[in-house]
Amino acid sequence: HFRDAFLARYFIKSGLNLDVMAHRPVVLYINGAFYGVANLREKSDEYYLLHNYGVDPENVDLLEEDTAVVVGDFVAFDSTFQYVMSNDLRLEANFQKAATYFDVENIAEGFIVQSGLNNGDWLHNNTKYWREKTPEARWRYLIFDMDIAMGRHGWSAYHQNNLDSLLTPLAGHNKHVDLFLKLLENDNYRYYFINRYADLFNTIFLPEVFRKEVDQTVAEIDAEMPRHFDRWGWPGYDLWANERIPVLYDYLENRPVYAREDVKDYFGLANEVKLRLQTYPPGAGTIEINTIVPEELPWEGVYFNGVPVELTIKPYPGYQFQHWQSEKTITSPDQTPSIRYNFQEDDEIVAYFSGGPKEPLLSAYINQDRELQLGLTLPNADDVSFSLFDVQGRLLQHFPAAYLPTGYNERNLAIPALPTGVYVLTASGKSTQVGVKFVIAN
């Protein structure tokens, strides 16, 4: 169950809008006897909803496939499902009402990961969905048992069109497919789904990014696997390490090309387009494209002709946004901070800024990983070192100088565990002298 385990963790780590079962690899002993490597994981039941959402197990509908009840009943689902199926969702008012019944972003996310990663053991199986029994609650899907995905069998190979094989044969025969197809009749939702699909394959499903998660998962259990196979036999460590795991790497490397082709074919899109994003001057701001914010600029991603792309700019301190312009599509300056264009061919889009800080600007805070996250905006490039002090001026840690370009720079610094209180971070260079106070709380 390697695939299911590492995908669940990766989805959680990546902040996807999914309800997935967390797991931890363990070495199992029963009455002192070694039973090998196992996955300790959450169970897809009402207590998952209690511990993750605080939902009362006696005040929830948790349903399975088309007719099975885990807890609750089908009364609310049948009513909301009937609304979707009997109304024209091309009308935005009707779609927005449907979106108060169903978490449409969660539904899109589920169809993306299941079809994009070739999990064919879904919709007719391994399908659970839930809603708290409150007026404002919406239906969401649980994601579990994805061990058939990513090349486990021939029909989940990287070249298989799982999007079409999930939707076309089951249309009219499966409530969940019918619900999703009905939502897709709305232009904006269809654009959202396709762009979100592209966003994920431009980021977390890139081979070089995805591979790191496989590497980490293999490394966690590899030392115990020879003993595991000594206990259980087939297929044996050598076959697992030299044939089974390489299938995953081969899948990761090849899947994005076919996944995009699947989307293009299913929705009848004309062609793919490669978009390059950057700011001028560099480091003047961030660009949000659809649902993602690239960590570094310039950045490239693949999207689709026929599906408008949304771009939003956020200036860094000291800069003022002026306009967008591109080589082929946005040929005249567009001064709107948030824009939406259909790109018919490869293009380079630049967000232009004026101004810039006269003096260095520094910010700092403790992030969720308990690292010191800093932002430093420089009027000029410099070799900058950072120093951490307590409020009495005692040096706690020094970080050696490194080159930082003009504009905004963000860094995460590993610091020791420190007690609650106020601290000072300084940045020093040939043309940089700036400090800032920040708070460490419990």
Locate the predicted segments by residue.
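Surface-exposed interfaces of beta-sheet-rich extracellular modules
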Residues: 228-229, 308-335
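Short, glycine-anchored, charge-dense loop/turn motifs used at functional sites
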Residues: 388-396, 423
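C-terminal tail/sorting-segment detector
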Residues: 374, 398, 411-412, 416, ...
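Conserved "repeat-terminator" motif of extracellular CCP/Sushi domains
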Residues: 336-356
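Glycine-centered coil/turn sites that cap beta-strands in beta-rich domains
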Residues: 356-388, 410-417
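Conserved ATP-binding subdomain of kinase catalytic cores across diverse folds
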Residues: 1-72
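Extracellular modular ligand-binding repeats in secreted and cell-surface proteins
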Residues: 290-319, 343
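Middle-to-C-terminal accessory/interaction subdomains
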Residues: 25-29, 34-38, 49, 66-278
